[in-house]
Amino acid sequence: MPSFDIVSEIDMQEVRNAVDNANREISTRFDFRGVQASFELNEKSESIKVSSESDFQVKQLVDILREKLLKRGIEGGALEVPEQIEHSGKSWIVDAKMKKGIETDIAKKLVKLIKDSKLKVQSQIQGDEVRVTGKSRDDLQGAMALVRKGELGQPFQFKNFRD
């Protein structure tokens, strides 16, 4: 029976490249000239520390980071930015986390979305991924299109497509 897995993975090398590109851009931008602004990648905790001298500049920096991530092939939904901006001395800091893996509640929504579509496929949760099986390849491709359209707040990739 044909099947595929729905996963949510991030290539940390591409994240590192995007952070380097963003740091390079803020060093050449006129509106950040003479301002202590930076991006710091922590690969162990899979987070990016965005810091600047004012809160609106932090928001601009997050937009720059999202743009650079998108150019490197990482969707903006993979970056989880808290609403609260920390203020410490004369710097404003946001610790943005990268979403990796499918959480249980999102996996349940994904399974429900596929079941409610009346497609002739079965879906099951396997750890941090969802396996979808069906009798025909066309049904599986319909399920892929459905998942791409479904706004679940997280980017998904499809792998292990087997006939």
UniProtKB/Swiss-Prot annotation:
Pfam families cross-referenced by the UniProt entry: DUF520
InterPro entries given in the database record: DUF520, UPF0234-like_C, UPF0234_N, YajQ-like_sf
Keywords tagged on the record: Nucleotide-binding
Lineage: Bacteria, Pseudomonadati, Pseudomonadota, Gammaproteobacteria, Enterobacterales
GO cellular component terms, semicolon-separated: cytosol
Similarity section: Belongs to the YajQ family.
Purpose: Nucleotide-binding protein.
Matches recorded under CDD domains: YajQ_like
Protein name stated in the entry: Nucleotide-binding protein ETA_25210
Organism of this sequence: Erwinia tasmaniensis (strain DSM 17950 / CFBP 7177 / CIP 109463 / NCPPB 4357 / Et1/99)
Gene Ontology molecular function terms on file: nucleotide binding
